[in-house]
Amino acid sequence: MNRQLVNILTALFAFFLGTNHFREAFCKDHDSRSGKHPSQTLSPSDFLDKLMGRTSGYDARIRPNFKGPPVNVTCNIFINSFGSVTETTMDYRVNIFLRQQWNDSRLAYSEYPDDSLDLDPSMLDSIWKPDLFFANEKGANFHDVTTDNKLLRISKNGKVLYSIRLTLTLSCPMDLKNFPMDVQTCTMQLESFEYTMNDLIFEWLSDGPVQVAEGLTLPQFILKEEKELGYCTKHYNTGKFTCIEVKFHLERQMGYYLIQMYIPSLLIVILSWVSFWINMDAAPARVALGITTVLTMTTQSSGSRASLPKVSYVKAIDIWMAVCLLFVFAALLEYAAVNFVSRQHKEFLRLRRRQKRQNKEEDVTRESRFNFSGYGMGHCLQVKDGTAVKATPANPLPQPPKDADAIKKKFVDRAKRIDTISRAAFPLAFLIFNIFYWITYKIIRHEDVHKK
């Protein structure tokens, strides 16, 4: 009886044991078919600690592939805004998303079901990151409203995506010879600060390396679609460092400068020509008009240079302002010439009267020299063959001067002729200058810039 009871208990134990093994096998098979893993029971915190925490053995101070091939970091930027191009300081301001991607095999995982993990920005201190900086940066700031504008994403294969939002003020050396019809090329250089090319290499993303927000406009420039991508590897005493760059081509719009500089100065020049139609006797009016236009043109020229740097070469706007000032000043000098010529008849008559007076004095002196009336000889010097010979002056008296009104009319006509010629010569000369000016800067030099 006891042996029979033992056999029954043994059979029941074997049955339950077999059932338990079957259940475990079934659960494993079911989990494998459903994509679940036994480690799913790990909490996210435990998983991250195991992946990059203290228990993982991950060291953020050591780059991937340590003492091996360099880490290839792929970069691309998305431009949110582009503006504040300043000529005086020669820089520009831009707001971008900077995205860097690299592979860190130490962060590869297979225990977690998700293909990628979006981590909190605070985890950035726990992983290795490239030491990227902007070589031509003059000022920059991060954004933390309402939270840090940073993104960290890790894929199963160990690929890391690091995105950050930045506002940068970058240096942009400008050539202002054609200002304000110029095309500027501004660069953005991304360089490694610590790691040489033996450890780190930057590359542009093959698909869409530089993206621009839709509808992005600049107040004074047109941002051209073509952007030059290239390498700018730097050689220092400390080694050779990786560097990539993008060049933005900015074409200046002339609308503002036409309204503020070109059209006002053109009108001032035309206003100075009104003097040619004012009577030459109206000296106060013509002088006041000439001086006013000269001073206004000088102020306009100074204002055009106020917002520009002090460069050693001549700009297109400088040539325009200088020629306009020259035309205005020439119009003032033209009236000085007209006034001088119109008053020359007075000087001419004054010289005639002086010459006549001098001639009379000479005649009187000459007559008194040969007058012997005190000795009863009168005007007779000698008698030859019964004929008395009178003393005659050596130089005959000059012809009587022309009528004063005729002389005045002659000089006034000359002055009027100067005004008449100026009415046509000044506009014609200014028109010729405009033709050469606009052809040179809008066509010839513009094409040269595009060829470069």
Swiss-Prot record:
Residues 279-283, 337-420 are cytoplasmic. Residues 28-256, 305-315, 442-452 are extracellular. The keyword Nucleotide-binding does not apply. This is Glycine receptor subunit alpha-2. It comes from Rattus norvegicus (Rat). Residues 1-27 form the signal peptide. GO terms for cellular component: cell projection; chloride channel complex; GABA-ergic synapse; glycinergic synapse; plasma membrane; postsynaptic specialization membrane. Strychnine binds at R99.
